[in-house]
Regions:
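Compact, glycine-rich, soluble single-domain proteins
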Residues: 4-87
Length: 87
């Protein structure tokens, strides 16, 4: 069982994140979703809100303006309408 997975977050302007992480939480259409290593395949819409991930450098928070997420083969790809690091 893997203890990390790859997180990639993109906006139309740039790549925000490309990192190995231990866990991600984000605002899904029907509530908060959590993703851990070896998560089942998933495609979901994301609501505007906070995406939080835990990696080597600790906990990181991003504000996303909605979008979509796909989880497959220990890679989570997020296509966000907009995004920036949380203050």
């Amino acid at each position: 069982m893997a203890d990390r997975f790859r997180l990639r977050v993109y906006t139309p302007e740039r790549e925000l994140v490309d990192a190995e992480v231990r866990e991600v939480t984000a605002e899904g259409t029907w509530g908060q979703i959590g993703v851990l290593p070896d998560h089942a395949a998933l495609v979901t819409a994301l609501e505007p809100g906070e995406l939080v991930y835990r990696g080597e450098g600790g906990v990181v928070r991003l504000h996303l303006g909605g979008g979509f997420a796909e989880v497959r083969d220990n890679v989570m790809t997020v296509l966000a309408d907009s995004g920036e690091p949380a203050s």
